Structure formats: C-alpha cells, structure tokens
C-alpha cells in the first residue's frame, strides 16, 4: 500500500508496472445505432419475430385456460358473463360471486363451519377418545392407530 500512496501523493496517476492501455479514436457507431433505434427504423416485424424465436408463439397453459378472470383486448373479461369489465368492476364481480357461493353452500358445509366457529367437536375416535369436528379429520386420525 505504501507504493500506491506514493503514486497518489506525488500526483502521478500512472503505474509503470502496468502496460499502457491502447486508446482508440472515438467512433459514432454506438450513437448512430441508438439514434436509428429511437427514430423507429427498427421494424415491428423484426422485434416480434425475435420475440417468437426466443419465447415461441403464445399458448395459454391449462391453468390460464381455467382461470376465472382472463384478459381480452387489454380488458378483464369474466367467463361467466362475457362482458368487458373495468378494474373496479372485477372486484365487485368477485364479491358478488362470493356472496352467491355462500348462499349455495349445503347444510353440511354450514354445519362444519358452525362447528369450527364454536369449537364443537362431536365426533370421537373409538380407540383413544380424541374428539374432532369433521369426519375426514377423524378418518385421517384413525389411520394412525
């Protein structure tokens, strides 16, 4: 570090141990290329074909196909009603659908929800006596015996 400090303190910014860097005259190639890009000389076709070569043509995945909300013409569209929606309408539609789903729930589902909310566990294991609120949890427990 002493030698480096000597170079800096003397105002000598060159190091004799390092070979001099070759300097090339500045070129306008990069600037010209950037200018032609900004001017829009690049065709949309070449950009799109490059994208397709990299990513391939767009094909929806099975998850996208069954997604409740899909994009069409840059607007949300709900499969059930096929109407273009604004972002606020998407939220309203989702809330409305949730309310309908709640009304359509079966008595059994409501009974299980009530048990969960109250902590009621009327089902018990015949082997150990441990209590459960749903049949499927009891059945899973009984497999451990």
Curated annotation (Swiss-Prot):
The keyword Heme does not apply. Residues 1-25 are annotated as: Disordered. GO terms for cellular component: nucleus. One of its GO terms (molecular function) is DNA binding. A zinc finger (C2H2-type) spans 123-145. InterPro entries: Znf_C2H2_sf, Znf_C2H2_type. It is found in: Nucleus. Its main location: nucleus. Keywords: DNA-binding, Metal-binding, Nucleus, Transcription, Transcription regulation, Zinc, Zinc-finger. It comes from the Eukaryota. Disulfide bonds: none annotated. May be involved in transcriptional regulation. Belongs to the krueppel C2H2-type zinc-finger protein family. This is Oocyte zinc finger protein XlCOF8.4I. It comes from Xenopus laevis (African clawed frog). The lineage of its organism: Eukaryota, Metazoa, Chordata, Craniata, Vertebrata.
């Amino acid at each position: 570090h002493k030698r480096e400090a000597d170079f800096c303190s003397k105002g000598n910014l060159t190091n004799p141990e390092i070979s001099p860097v070759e300097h090339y005259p500045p070129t306008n190639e990069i600037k010209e290329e950037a200018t032609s890009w900004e001017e829009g000389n690049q065709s949309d076709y070449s950009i799109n074909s490059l994208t397709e070569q990299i990513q391939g043509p767009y094909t929806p995945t099975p998850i996208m196909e069954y997604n409740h909300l899909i994009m069409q013409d840059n607007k949300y569209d709900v499969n059930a009603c096929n109407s273009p929606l604004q972002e606020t309408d998407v939220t309203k539609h989702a809330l409305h659908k949730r309310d309908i789903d709640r009304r359509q729930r079966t008595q059994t589902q409501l009974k299980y929800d009530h048990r969960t909310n109250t902590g009621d566990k009327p089902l018990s294991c015949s082997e150990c006596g441990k209590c459960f609120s749903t049949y499927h949890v009891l059945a899973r427990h009984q497999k451990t015996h």
